């Protein structure tokens, strides 16, 4: 949720530095049959990143819904887990990524019409609810269609909303943490939580969550 009234400075993330011999998939991931979404094994990740580089993921999962993600969290055990959005500003090693990669690119793109309200001062405000898979450019344009101001500086930020919140993305003096009202996430146990803005700590290109981990 956002309260509303270009160049991106993302640090690049490097993945897949460690490598070891993968176990047979049926032994490592015996629970995959519980997933409703698409599952790809030993999938090359280059096509899923903006700079088109990267080796294979042991397992690449496209969850159909939140329940799929909960299933992953409850069954993955000690397997590493990485959440992939639009794949912007991301460097994946040619050796690939061991463990599980979950792509949110094709899901969680719901975006609601603004909910308008008036503050005690009489000023008119609006709240927009959007999924983690919504592109930042689309979110900014969606707000503009309703003559809302507050996130227009973020229109040029690459990537999706979920990643932007995790990194407290910003441009031209505006950061996502300045307009964020609340965030709904899954904690490491797969439980749904909603955190208000004042429960989060925003730093330069970083958002600190109370429990340290979670999936937006």
Go through each PLM region and give its residues:
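Flexible, small-/acidic-enriched active-site or ligand-binding loops
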Residues: 202-208
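Structural signature of FAD isoalloxazine-binding scaffolds in flavoprotein oxidoreductases
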Residues: 54, 61-66, 91-112, 166-196, ...
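Charged/polar low-complexity intrinsically disordered segments
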Residues: 5-7, 12-18, 23
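Anion-binding (especially nucleotide phosphate/pyrophosphate-binding) glycine-rich loop
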Residues: 27-161
């Amino acid at each position: 949720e956002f309260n509303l009234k270009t160049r991106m400075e993302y640090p690049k993330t490097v993945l897949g530095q460690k490598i070891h011999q993968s176990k047979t998939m049926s032994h490592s991931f015996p629970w995959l049959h519980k997933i409703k979404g698409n599952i790809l094994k030993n999938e090359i990740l280059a096509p899923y990143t903006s700079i088109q580089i990267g080796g294979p993921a042991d397992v690449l999962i496209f969850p159909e819904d939140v329940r799929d993600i909960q299933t992953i969290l409850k069954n993955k055990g000690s397997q590493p887990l990485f959440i992939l959005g639009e794949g912007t500003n991301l460097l994946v090693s040619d050796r690939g990524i061991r463990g599980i990669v979950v792509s949110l690119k094709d899901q969680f793109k719901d975006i609601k019409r603004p909910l308008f309200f008036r503050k005690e001062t009489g000023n008119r405000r609006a709240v927009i609810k959007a999924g983690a898979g919504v592109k930042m450019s689309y979110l900014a344009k969606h707000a503009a269609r309703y003559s809302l101001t507050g996130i227009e500086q973020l229109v040029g930020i690459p990537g999706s909303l979920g990643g932007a919140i995790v990194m407290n993305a910003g441009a031209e003096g505006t950061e996502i943490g300045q307009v964020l009202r609340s965030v709904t996430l899954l904690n490491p146990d797969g439980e749904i939580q909603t955190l208000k803005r004042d429960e989060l700590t925003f730093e330069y290109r970083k958002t600190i969550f109370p429990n340290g981990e979670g999936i937006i």
